[in-house]
């Protein structure tokens, strides 16, 4: 599989969709990743709480433990809009998918109508997050076709009918499904 273990990467820009809950409102967030030449680093921007800043280490370690080699490249992650405070670990999965997409692992169309939300354990397993039902309900209203969430949140997510729910146990399971879209 491209990018799995050894190999060359087609570096570039990739964008995925996610969401966060602020008070009683769901705010959509675009997670953008750019992987390119420069001093090797993993930098995140976009009005981030400490939990979101900590995602950098969770994502890098989870990717490595899922078998993906992090390239020695400059990787910049932007969570937008910048005016919305990003809180919690809900962005771990979308950050990982955006980075892997920027590495050329997935086709661009793989995530165009999909919303991703979930925390990553260091072993690459998805951990439950709070607020999945309101996120899924708003994703449905916004026209998303599918929500990719932790398997442990799947029952809650399925309470919102009329939108496909993919409950995954691991980052690798998510990646394999997106590669074949």
PLM feature segments, named:
Residues 2-179:
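Peripheral, non-AAA+ core regions of ATP-driven protein-machinery
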């Amino acid at each position: 599989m491209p990018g799995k273990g050894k190999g060359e990467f087609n570096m570039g820009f990739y964008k995925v969709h996610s969401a966060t809950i602020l008070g009683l409102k769901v705010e959509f967030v675009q997670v953008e990743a750019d992987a390119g030449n420069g001093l090797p680093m993993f930098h995140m921007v976009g009005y981030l709480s400490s939990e979101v800043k900590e995602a950098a280490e969770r994502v890098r370690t989870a990717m490595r433990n899922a078998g993906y080699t992090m390239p020695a490249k400059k990787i910049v992650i932007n969570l937008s809009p910048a005016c919305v405070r990003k809180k919690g670990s809900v962005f771990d999965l979308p950050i990982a998918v955006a980075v892997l997409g920027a590495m050329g692992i997935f086709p661009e169309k793989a995530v165009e109508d999909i919303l991703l939300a979930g925390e990553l354990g260091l072993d690459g397993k998805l951990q439950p997050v709070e607020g999945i039902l309101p996120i899924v309900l708003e994703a449905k209203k916004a026209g998303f076709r599918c929500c990719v969430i932790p398997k442990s949140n799947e029952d809650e997510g399925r309470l919102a009918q009329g939108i496909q729910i993919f409950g995954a146990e691991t980052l690798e399971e998510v990646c394999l499904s997106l590669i074949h879209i």
